[in-house]
Every structure is written in structure tokens, then in C-alpha cells.
Regions:
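Bacterial N-terminal signal peptides that target proteins for export
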Residues: 2-14
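Compositionally biased amphipathic helical and low-complexity segments enriched in hydrophobic
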Residues: 10-11, 19, 160
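Intrinsically disordered, low-complexity segments
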Residues: 2-4, 22-25, 243
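Subset of outer-membrane beta-barrel
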Residues: 28-349
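Bacterial N-terminal signal peptides
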Residues: 14-24
Length: 349
């Protein structure tokens, strides 16, 4: 496909995204605190600094947890280890591996795999009784274990499926385990343009049982994850000057059950826009800028925005080994401190 045709296709795709956003903007709902929010904050410094607009990005260092189909385009093995600096005694850490493989006796096509672990939690929670006396310090954690597989149907089209295992602890003996599935696809429209789609968190939920603590007075509370639809496009700028990505993310609110008063919470969907770019000053240095959580339906539009920037440095030690360090800085709503992440990226052939 010629460059001019790629630009036309990209413009049409952006028009579709804007049309979806305009329709969704009629909703009065705001992006709420859905269950499993830690798994939607982003994965690694590169993704965070580019506004998490990564569902279609096959041109940079790929993290397949954004879309299970991405791994089919990661030729070199890519290992990421990330640590996030957060306020309010929170933690968020990443460990991931993504690589494309050729199947036995296969001349064309191939398959890809992603293995990842996301860990989040809050420590030093001050516990008090009804008389405000301190009873100890508590902590909570959440984990996501991810296995993503992808298959190239041809050199330009890949399909993928991701398997997730969530394990979380709310309080002492109150834990929950959940299994979920992601589906994704990538289409490489030209050498400079790729399109991506992913549907995430089929079946994800937390089920909290408190009978271990309260006995017969305990109950079971179910917190369902929202189902998420990601659509995106990534474009390589002329002369390989950089990458520009745009993505739209649709949150489909879970079905709620009636509470003790018989009231069923209102169900509403939310749409957010994501933008990101990566500029290569020299091959070993990359500057990144992004904007996440662009929610046109929010009452406080500016209050939901998450602007970000970052830098990436890498060094080749041989023809088969490359080591990089990525840094991201992202402003967080309702907090005086920014989200900062440092990720070590190790690539090998």
C-alpha cells in the first residue's frame, strides 16, 4: 500500500474514532472506580509515557498485555521489568516477556507469546476500632498473571487470545481468585500503518466472602470488572522520525444486582481517548509524550486528564543483546504527586 493510501486510511480511521466519541459524549456518567483498576493503569514506562495508546503499536518495543495479538510482531525477545513510584503507600510493578516464534517447518507467518505479571497494593493502612484505638497496620494487594498467544494468519494479519488469572487480598482471610479472557487482532495496513482492536476482561470479577471473619453474619459480595473495547491506529512518521498512536477505549459497565434496599445502580458506559507519540532524535534516544483519559462526557473534563512524558535510552552490547532504560512521568488526578515509572528493557535475538 502506498504512503498516500495509508494516510487516507489513517484519516478515515481517526474520523471513525471521533464519531464514536461524539456519540458517547451524550452520556452523563463519569469514569468510576471499577474493580481491577490497577490492571488498567498501564504497563511499563513506554506505555505510560505515550498515554497507553498501545493497542495497535507494532513498530516500537511491544508489550503484548495491551493486545494479545501484538506479540506476533515482536521479532526480538523483549523482557520488561518496571517499578512505579506512587503516593499514598501504593505500589505497582510489572514483569513481562514478549516474543514472536516460527512454528516448526513454517516458512511464513508465525506465532507470538506474552508472559506477564502485574502486582499492585497498598501498605501501612491504619486500622482502628469503633473507639478509634489503633488495632494495627493492614495491607491489601492485587495480582494479574497473564498468558497471551498470537497467530499470524498472513504477514499482515494476526489474531490473539489472552488468559488472565487475578488473585487479590482485601483483608486477612478475605481473598478472591478470578479467571478472564482477552481477545485481540492486528492488521498491518502498510509498512507505516497498523490498526488494532482488543476486547478485554471477559468474565473478570472479584468475589469476597467474609464468613471466615464474621461467621454466620458474613456474606458474599461480587465486584465485576468492566468489559473494555480498545480500538487504535499507529503510524510511523516519514524518515522513521517517530511513531504517532491514537486509541479509543470503551468501558462497558458490568450488570449490577440490587442492593439491600432493592435499588439497582444505574448502568452506564464511558469512552476515553488516548494519544501518544515517540520521537527518535538519534537511534539510541527517544522522547515520548502522551495524554490519557480524555473523557468528553465527564463533568470535570480537565480533572480526569493524565498528561505524560518520558524518555528512552538503549545500548547494543552485541548483535544479539540490547539493554534499555525507560522513564515516564504522568500527572494523576486527585493527587499532588505524579506517577513515575522506571522500566528496564532487555532485548535479545
Amino acid at each position: 500500500m502506498k504512503t498516500s493510501e495509508s494516510k487516507i486510511l489513517l484519516k478515515r480511521f481517526i474520523a471513525v474514532i471521533l464519531f464514536v466519541i461524539c456519540i458517547s459524549a451524550t452520556s452523563q456518567a463519569q469514569l468510576g472506580s471499577y474493580a481491577g483498576s490497577f490492571s488498567r493503569m498501564g504497563f511499563g514506562a513506554r506505555g505510560l509515557s505515550m498515554g497507553n495508546a498501545m493497542v495497535s503499536d507494532i513498530f516500537g518495543n511491544i508489550n503484548g498485555i495491551y493486545n494479545p495479538a501484538l506479540s506476533a510482531f515482536q521479532i526480538d525477545g523483549n523482557v520488561n521489568l518496571g517499578y512505579t513510584f506512587l503516593s499514598l503507600d501504593r505500589k505497582l510493578n510489572f514483569l513481562g516477556f514478549t516474543k514472536k516464534f516460527k512454528l516448526p517447518k513454517q516458512q511464513q507467518g508465525g506465532a507470538g507469546i506474552t508472559l506477564a505479571w502485574v502486582n499492585a497494593g497498598v501498605s501501612d493502612i491504619d486500622g482502628r476500632d469503633n473507639d478509634t484505638r489503633q488495632i494495627g497496620l493492614f495491607s491489601t494487594f492485587e495480582n494479574e498473571f497473564y498468558l497471551g498467544t498470537a497467530f499470524l494468519l498472513n504477514e499482515n494479519l494476526a489474531l490473539g487470545v489472552g488468559f488472565k488469572l487475578y488473585y487479590a487480598k482485601l483483608f486477612e482471610e478475605v481473598t478472591s481468585t478470578s479467571f478472564a479472557i482477552d481477545l485481540g487482532a492486528i492488521y498491518k495496513a502498510s509498512k507505516n500503518l497498523s490498526l488494532g482492536i482488543a476486547i478485554k476482561d471477559f468474565g473478570a470479577k472479584y468475589e469476597w466472602k467474609t464468613s471466615e471473619i464474621y461467621g454466620s453474619l458474613g456474606n458474599t459480595t461480587v465486584d465485576k470488572f468492566p468489559r473494555i473495547l480498545d480500538l487504535g491506529a499507529s503510524y510511523v512518521l516519514p524518515k522513521n522520525f517517530g511513531i504517532v498512536s491514537i486509541a479509543v477505549q470503551q468501558y462497558f459497565s458490568p450488570d449490577y444486582e440490587a442492593d439491600s434496599t432493592g435499588v439497582v445502580p444505574e448502568k452506564s458506559n464511558n469512552t476515553v481517548l488516548r494519544l501518544g507519540t515517540e520521537i527518535s532524535i538519534v537511534p539510541q534516544v527517544k522522547f515520548r509524550v502522551g495524554l490519557d483519559r480524555i473523557d468528553f462526557s465527564a463533568d470535570d473534563f480537565a480533572g480526569n486528564l493524565r498528561p505524560s512524558f518520558g524518555i528512552g535510552l538503549d545500548k547494543s552490547f552485541s548483535k544479539t543483546i540490547n539493554l534499555g532504560i525507560d522513564y515516564s512521568f504522568q500527572l494523576e488526578p486527585f493527587s499532588h504527586d505524579a506517577i513515575q515509572n522506571i522500566t528496564v528493557a532487555f532485548k535479545f535475538k
